[in-house]
């Protein structure tokens, strides 16, 4: 079985693009449309990696990182935040919450795969 990745994004088309790239590279991928759904899935299964959007209604990406880190099984799971915002202050908040990486949107599929591979392969 391949490595499992949870993709979290409130925009369906973006979720589908990320999923297509990751599945095309042989990863097992599950989707969540928001932070609440992501937490529910994370409580039932430990993923090898989480890729989450930052700008989501309700639970944003940085808050989701913090909530995932509160689940002991996610202490060492890589979490990458995707965002159109790339400011140093927001990245610092992400790192402080426990984010492993930050990637700008729109993303380059090859760059995404390179980042994903460094954490799960």
Residue ranges with predicted function:
Residues 26-33, 41:
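Short hydrophobic/Thr-rich beta-strand motif most characteristic of the beta2 strand and flanking loop
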Residues 16-24:
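Charged docking surfaces used in two-component/phosphorelay signaling
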């Amino acid at each position: 079985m391949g490595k499992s990745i949870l993709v979290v994004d409130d925009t369906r088309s973006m979720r589908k693009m990320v999923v297509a790239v990751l599945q095309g590279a042989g990863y097992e991928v599950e989707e969540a449309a928001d932070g609440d759904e992501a937490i529910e899935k994370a409580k039932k299964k430990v993923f090898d990696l989480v890729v989450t959007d930052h700008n989501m209604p309700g639970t944003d990406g940085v808050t989701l990182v913090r909530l995932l880190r509160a689940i002991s099984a996610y202490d060492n799971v890589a979490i990458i935040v995707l965002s159109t915002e790339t400011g140093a202050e927001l990245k610092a908040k992400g790192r402080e919450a426990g984010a492993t990486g930050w990637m700008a949107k729109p993303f380059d599929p090859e760059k995404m795969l390179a980042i994903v591979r460094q954490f799960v392969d």
